[in-house]
C-alpha cells in the first residue's frame, strides 16, 4: 500500500469528498473555502508534524482510545451517508447501511485487506472521472464556460425531467432551513398522503394553517409563503417554476453568501488540527518530497473534480437546490442528461465509487489504530470483537438521519483537541504522561462546549465560535498544559 494511497484513503472519506460539491452548490465561491482546507490541511500536517521513532509516550492508552473515538465518528458519518444515498435511490435506508457496514466489517477482520486499498481507490477514481467526462461531453461546454453560464442564469427553474415534477419524490430537507420559501405563485401536489403546514403572508397579516392532503390534491402558494412538510412526504412541483430554496439568480450564487466570516477561522483551526492528529500522531518518519508531491497532486485532482461536478450539476440539475442541498443527491443528481446509450450505466458509477472509497478508508483507519497499539504489534487493528462492536454501533446510530459532513467536522475537532497538541509539542520523555493529562483536558472542554452548542444555537460572531467549533478553545488549553509540562523544574 503506497504512502499516497494510504493518506488519501485516510483523509478523504466519501463524507468529506462528496461534501465538497455540495458546499460549492450551497454557497458558491464560499464553498471553495472548504475545498481549499481539504487540500491544504493534510499537506501542512505532513510537513510540520513532529515525527520521530517510537517513544514511551506511545505506550499510553489514551491516544488509542481518543483515536478510536475519532474513527468511530468517521465511520458513523459515512454510514449515515450510505443510508441517505440508499433512501435517495429508492431503497430502504437500512439496506445501504447494511451493504456498507457489512463490506467494511469483512475487510476489517481480514488481515490481508491492506493489499486491496490501491485497487479500491483506483476503482473509486474511475467511478468519479467517467461520469464527469460523460457529463461534460453531453453538456458540450468546458468547466470554465459552464461556471460562467451558471453565473449568468436569471434563475434556477425546475426541469421537466425532475423527479419532483413527475411522478413526485420524497422531499428531505438538506443543509439550511427546514421550510420552503416561495418567490412566485406555485402549485404543490401531494403524491401521497401528507399534512402540509403553510405560513401565508398577506401584507401585514400572517396566517398559519395545516392541510391534510390525499394523493392528487393540490395547494397553491403565493410569493412569500412558507411550506413545511412531514418527514417522508412525497410532493410534486410545477415544471418551469423557480426552485424553492435556490439562489435568486446565477449572479447571487456566484457572488456567494455573506455568512459569519468568523466561522471560517474556526473551521480552518478544526480541519488543520484534525489533519495533524489523524495523519501524524504515532507515525514514525517524515514523508519524502516525492511522496508529498504525489499526495498533493491527488488532492488537487479531487478538489478539481468536486468543483467541476458542482458546476455541471448546477447547470443541468437545478432541482438539487430544492429544500436545501443534501449531500446524497450529489451521488446521483436527479435530472442530469447523459449521452445516448449511457444513461443506464454511468449514473450508478458514482455511488459505487463512494462505496469503494469507504471500504478503502475503513481498512486504512484500522491500520492507523494499529500503529498506536500498546502491544507494539498492531493487534488492536485485528481485534474482531472490538471492530465488530464499533461497526455495529456506528451502523445502529446511522439508522437515524444526521448530517455526514458535520460528523466529519466533529471527528476532526475531537482529534484536534485531544491529539494534535501532543503531536506539535510532545512532552519530555520523563513526563510523557502529561500528554494524557492534556488530552483529557482537551476532551473535557471539547465535550462541554459541544453540548453547550446544541442548546445555544444561533449565536453569531466571536461569542458563538467556541460553541460551533469547540476545538478553538479545547486545543489551546491542552497545549498550555503541555507547555507547563515542558518547563524545567526548579531546584
Feature roles, as predicted:
Residues 1-19, 99-117, 127-130, 192, ...:
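Membrane-interface "cap" regions at the ends of multi-pass membrane proteins
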Residues 1-55, 199, 262-357:
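Membrane-interface helix-loop-helix modules in multi-pass membrane proteins
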Residues 22-29, 49-55, 80-88, 100-122, ...:
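Membrane-water interface regions at transmembrane-helix termini and the short interhelical loops
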Residues 32-113, 148-195, 202-204, 212-217, ...:
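Helix-loop-helix module between adjacent transmembrane segments
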Residues 54-58, 110-121, 277-306, 365-382, ...:
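Hydrophobic, small-residue-rich membrane helices and short re-entrant helix-turn-helix hairpins
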Residues 57-72, 367-404, 412-413, 439:
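Loop-to-transmembrane helix boundary motifs in multi-pass membrane proteins
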Residues 88-89, 129-187, 212-272, 318-323, ...:
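Helix-loop-helix junctions that connect adjacent transmembrane segments
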Residues 100, 108-109, 115-135, 139-172, ...:
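A generic transmembrane alpha-helix motif of multi-pass inner-membrane proteins
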